[in-house]
Amino acid sequence: MGRVGVLLLNLGGPEKLEDVRPFLFNLFADPEIIRLPFPWLQKPLAWLISTLRAKKSQANYAEIGGGSPLLQITEAQASALTTRLERLGQDAKVYIGMRYWHPFTEEAVEKIKGDRLQRLVILPLYPHFSISTSGSSFRVLEEMWHNDPSLRQLDYSLIPSWYDHPGYLQAMADLIAQELKKFPNPDQAHIFFSAHGVPQSYVDEAGDPYQAEIEACTRLIMRTLDRPNQYTLAYQSRVGPVEWLKPYTEEALQKLGAEGIDDLLVVPISFVSEHIETLQEIDIEYREIAEEAGIDNFQRVPALNTHPVFIDALAQMVMDSLNDPPCTFETVPHPKKNMKMYPQERWEWGLTTAAEVWNGRLAMLGFIALLVELISGQGPLHFVGLL
């Protein structure tokens, strides 16, 4: 079979507060996040947005210890996966490629090229496929493969999604069952699945399978759990004025509180690692919303991280991928060329569609004013000492 590698893909996150601003710059410099009519404006606008948003985002990260634990957890997952593959008789080197922070996907690919692999399995750490997560990373890799003849010699295969893998479902069910034991009446606790949202247009216009996979996954987890608990699925992290997948997590929590639900177990279904959306958004923001709605006992299932059943599932996916016909970049969904994309981070873009348009116009005017001040050396930012 030759030398085998596994490339784990994820979003990435700032490891310390000083990383937040450049992380945001990378996020908004991605043309899949903000599409402009003039490409040369992409990076200047990303600089402006990241500068304006850095302080608020830093405050959120400060609430969870000053940075994202995502890389540390992903490294632990990679190490555990390497060990599990060895036990299965498969010698493989595991690489980590993050979309918007170190180690970048490009860095991982350079290491892969240097190691002269014969086989590569590309495994996103997103159970459910979306054009904005796995799809975004796949598009970066596809462009690299297109531009580099040496990469085209590498025998590779993608694992687009794995929301229905029995090992993953069992690991999720095990975690839920453990947390249910903490409630006075475990079978009466309401199970609340919170998935990361995407704009409704991704599903309606681009054919993104994300919503269908999330809904199917929720049903499969409940079937695997085999408990009588009632459950709800909602979508978190909505940004901007456009409609996202519904119901929204905050509204669903308020509705359950009004219905008299006291015991609630939140399951972060989109996330296999602890990061800002679990530690800050769910544990702090949504907990506060739930308590204000009258939900007295708010608990959360931990992310999978290095749960042994989960790691076993990842290893089995890799082994199956090595033995099955390859899945290539051409086989996964691609967004339309003119489709507007939104980041997988939470930023306020405006209250209405008209407000979003005006926000963009004002941002452009602000950017032009900034250029004038930088060239002239005079202006309000110089006066207050910011430049």
Swiss-Prot record:
UniProt-annotated stretches for the region Ferrochelatase: 1-318
Enzyme class: lyase
Alphabetized Pfam families for the sequence: Ferrochelatase (PF00762)
Catalytic activity: heme b + 2 H(+) = protoporphyrin IX + Fe(2+)
Main location: cytoplasm
EC number: 4.98.1.1
Spans annotated as Hlip domain: 319-387
Binding residues for Fe cation: 196, 277
Record GO terms (molecular function): ferrochelatase activity; metal ion binding
SUPFAM superfamilies: Chelatase, Chlorophyll a-b binding protein
Pathway(s) per entry: Porphyrin-containing compound metabolism; protoheme biosynthesis; protoheme from protoporphyrin-IX: step 1/1
Localization, UniProt: Cytoplasm
Name of the protein: Ferrochelatase
Gene: hemH
